[in-house]
């Protein structure tokens, strides 16, 4: 087969069993009933139990995607894991996935692209499929509950745990695939885990809160996320000479309902075409798009020829958009 493009061949997702309703967090933070939903659109999120690991959640989503694709596991040539919460700083977690999933001929690498991680992995996977003619497993997973600082309201109300996965396979059809990324490192510190890296390494005297997530300026995050997601989406649509009305389904990063609404308004994609899993699963960073994609495919299977738009923005600040055809 002459490989002309890549195609979405399989979808998977996984979430922990534990449901954390807003009432539990509102009581802990001393917030009035309904405060979280009014400001974020979130009603519930999933948090992992202490004995659950990122690798287990990622493997569950990946196993579902591989089964859905119906591709021999020995054919998978590369496994990419987008995560901000790997099992360990070293070694990477992706090789463990390939071991558990019996992907004997697959390379493996972790990607740290924050909320945009899945899009970076998707673009790299597309390039690999086109160059090598072999399928790639892309997984995005996070256990953000392990990084929440319950003393900081801005981040405590948003984040959940989830995993999503897709298999990208070679296609003889010339399916459209366009991408655009935007980075603004001047806002590098808007969302961060202050310590734990080489700049501020672990030391016993450091306060435990330094190893948890902090987001001190929610307004600036909102403004920058909308700018990046909207700008990247508009650029990728312009590159494809496509009007926003031609998009069949829009999969925005599920950061906050206000961000999703504003991006839809700005780029001109009808809100009804935008996936919405935020209410039930919260913000799981890079995992939100493949989670939404897998759930949407279960509810209403993707049809050949559909045009999909993905957009994300997150810590760094970094973000982007991908336009692809099923």
Swiss-Prot record:
GO terms for biological process: biotin biosynthetic process; fatty acid biosynthetic process; secondary metabolite biosynthetic process. Pathway: Cofactor biosynthesis; biotin biosynthesis. One of its GO terms (molecular function) is 3-oxoacyl-[acyl-carrier-protein] synthase activity. The active site is at 115, 253, 283. It is an enzyme of class 2 (transferase). It comes from the Bacteria. Residues 254-258 are annotated as: ACP-binding. It catalyses: malonyl-[ACP] + an acyl-CoA + H(+) = a 3-oxoacyl-[ACP] + CO2 + CoA; glutaryl-CoA + malonyl-[ACP] + H(+) = 3-oxo-6-carboxyhexanoyl-[ACP] + CO2 + CoA. It holds the Pfam family ACP_syn_III_C. Keywords: Acyltransferase, Biotin biosynthesis, Transferase. Its EC number is 2.3.1.-. InterPro entries: ACP_syn_III_C (IPR013747), ACP_syn_III_N (IPR013751), BioZ (IPR046403), Thiolase-like (IPR016039). HAMAP family: BioZ (MF_02249). NCBIfam families: PRK05963.1, PRK09352.1. Belongs to the thiolase-like superfamily. BioZ family. Involved in the formation of the biotin precursor pimeloyl-ACP. Catalyzes the condensation of glutaryl-CoA, an intermediate in lysine degradation, with malonyl-ACP to produce 3-oxopimeloyl-ACP. This is 3-oxopimeloyl-[acyl-carrier-protein] synthase. It comes from Brucella abortus (strain 2308). The lineage of its organism: Bacteria, Pseudomonadati, Pseudomonadota, Alphaproteobacteria, Hyphomicrobiales.
